[in-house]
Amino acid sequence: MQLYDVVIIGGGHAGCEAASASARSGACTALVTHKISALGTMSCNPAIGGLGKGHLVREIDALDGLMGRAADIAGIQFRLLNRRKGPAVRGPRTQADRKLYKKAIQKFLQEQDNLILIEDEAVDLIVKDNCVSGVVLKKQGELFSGAVVLTTGTFLNGLIHIGDKTWAAGRMGEHSSVQLAERLKKYDINLGRLKTGTPARLSKKTINWNCLSKQKADEDPVPFSLLTEKIEQPQIECAITRTNTQTHQIIRENIHRSALYSGMIEGLGPRYCPSVEDKIVKFGERDGHQIFLEPEGLNDDTIYPNGLSTSLPEDVQVALLRTIEGLESVKILQPGYAIEYDFVNPQQLTKTLELRSLPGLFLAGQINGTTGYEEAAAQGLLAGLNAARKVGGLNEIIISRSTAYIGVMVDDLVSRGVSEPYRMFTSRAEFRLSLRSDNADARLTPLAQQWGIVSQKRWDLYQQKQQRLDQARSICQKLFLTPNQASAHGLQVNHDGIRRSAYDLLAYPHMSIERLSHFWQQLQSIDPKTVESLEIEAQYAVYLEKQAQDISALQRDERLEIPSSLDFQTISGLSNELKTKIQKISPRSIADAQKIDGMTPAALSLIITYIQRQRREKAESA
């Protein structure tokens, strides 16, 4: 009999992080995948990070996960998105060499203690007394465990569509998990269908690069991981082109041949990553749509045309591509396709990502209705950690919305569910000033240390970093100027008689350590990385203090009970639609009311104010 503490099913981004987190927790862990050689495959675009997504990668790294380190090893075009905007919404991103990324992930897993890799297919769960106690494999039979983490990605009943052609597959060239999907239905799990897509892969040597504008990498690459000392790979350029009226005409003439518009596809696709057919149908008034030509590797002939996801027949794909500047003679290496797959309604999960109806079964990644490598990896880490802790008899880990984007995502999924693939954006976080990509380690690494999943090397580096920051902050807080002294140095402050520290002055627009060091030379000894952290911290200090108060108020308000006698129809300012929903659901607390679909912060504020006013009036009349 084969016995493990935790079994992970699936070797994509969620599965790899789940396996690593479980094993780092000390649990004897097995990772089951169709192909060990495919572990860590980037199934769609060759990039990691971006707006919102880059925050998740930094958080994964702060918890000692794999994705950030692998991206740094494989990164061939690092760019910090939104560089000109505030630090809270800046998004680190890199193009990655697919082969190098996969190689890095596989190396991490092969070197991980407490982890064994198994090449097989899961076809059923072992359930005893309504609790999951293992899996059944196609070749090796029963694997018993204390917990199971399902990270099936697009493989669960996956169907590929290209025009009128359809076949079962998890991704191009790999078969789907049909048996497991059928077995899940017998456990009365609420399943749905979603869809995603990918563009054709193009031959690099058949593209006319000379006529295209280029997008360069940042001169000073910003890595994802605290452990990365230097970006080693050479940095490459991407090219930019556009669709045109001729492209759009070909798509319109053949729209009936698209699997998406012929009625063959049932599942909804990601709103923020539409197919090119969707773009033309929904935004037909535009004369063109931007396409990024992204190399898939340093020594690879494959180009990923970001922005051209499609399920049109291959002949139509060739025709539309050759209307685009630079692609007049292009050859397709692999056609674009749409893929449909089963997902589980995430409202059936707890915030540990355990299925309520089947204790011992944890779900992570696209099976929970999300889209994207980063979203999957973050869920995988949390699910693997909680699976290991459940087996070890330890307290469960729930990450709050005010602590991390991971917490925002999980709360959104569990509380609100999904009607389309969920993608992370900074706009989803109420407290994004505190949840910056630059302070992910300060927010999460001490917690990860308590949970026992951080290496000694990372913990030492983190402590050294924080020590440098504490020392620099202390220096700045001990240096003062009066308003007259500030004016003498050309600094514009209010002449209110208040002495201001160097730390206070850093909150002023266009202020920097470099400028202050002209008359406070001791500031010149602060290293550049610490300078950046200190300047951001000081810039946000006042706002963060207010946000901390808001977080405390939210936590207090969430515990506020809603009287059963409360008539929501009497609360002015609430929409009639929301009044009807609330009255029907009858939430017992503000925390319950938050979970109602369509509930907004403004509406919550109206309800809280109304309840508090009623309480005051009742107290005054007593």
Swiss-Prot record:
Single GO term (MF): flavin adenine dinucleotide binding
SUPFAM superfamilies documented for this protein: FAD/NAD(P)-binding domain
GO biological process: tRNA methylation; tRNA wobble uridine modification
Family annotation (InterPro entries): FAD/NAD-bd_sf (IPR036188), GIDA_C_N (IPR049312), MnmG (IPR004416), MnmG-rel (IPR002218), MnmG-rel_CS (IPR020595), MnmG_C (IPR026904), MnmG_C_subdom (IPR047001), MnmG_C_subdom_sf (IPR044920)
Keywords, in A-Z order: Cytoplasm, FAD, Flavoprotein, NAD, tRNA processing
Keyword check for RNA-binding: no
Residues involved in FAD binding: G10, G11, G12, H13, A14, G15
Signal peptide: none
Keyword presence, Flavoprotein: yes
Annotated binding of NAD(+), by residue: 269-283
Domain of life: Bacteria
Subcellular location field: Cytoplasm
One Gene Ontology cellular component annotation held by this UniProt entry: cytosol
Entry cofactors: FAD
Main location: cytoplasm
Function noted in UniProt: NAD-binding protein involved in the addition of a carboxymethylaminomethyl (cmnm) group at the wobble position (U34) of certain tRNAs, forming tRNA-cmnm(5)s(2)U34.
SUBUNIT field: Homodimer. Heterotetramer of two MnmE and two MnmG subunits.
Family: Belongs to the MnmG family.
Protein name per Swiss-Prot or TrEMBL: tRNA uridine 5-carboxymethylaminomethyl modification enzyme MnmG
Species whose genome carries this gene: Bartonella quintana (strain Toulouse)
